[in-house]
Amino acid sequence: MRPSFPLLLIMLLVCTAHHMVSGENAQSCTPEQQKTCKQYSCINPCCENNQCRCGCGILEGESK
């Protein structure tokens, strides 16, 4: 049974919305950082503490 793509997309959107609502600075990248982020092969690259990361909290299980 292969994972369905729409389900993964919905999960990603929920995670992104969660970060926006919780007020974390996950998406606060400068334009220069955004260029660096695109070099990584990430599904959801973003910045956290001025560092480029994959997912920003999603892979860590949302535990802060």
Curated annotation (Swiss-Prot):
Tissue expr: Expressed by the venom gland.
GO MF annotations, alphabetized: toxin activity
Superkingdom of origin: Eukaryota
GO cellular component, one term: extracellular region
Posttranslational mods: Contains 4 disulfide bonds.
Main location: secreted
Keyword vocabulary terms for this entry: Disulfide bond, Secreted, Signal, Toxin
The keyword Transmembrane belongs to this UniProt entry's keyword annotation: no
Subcellular location: Secreted
Keyword Transmembrane helix included in the entry's annotation: no
Signal peptide: 1-23
Family of this protein: Belongs to the scoloptoxin-14 family.
Protein name: U-scoloptoxin(14)-Er1a
Originating species: Ethmostigmus rubripes
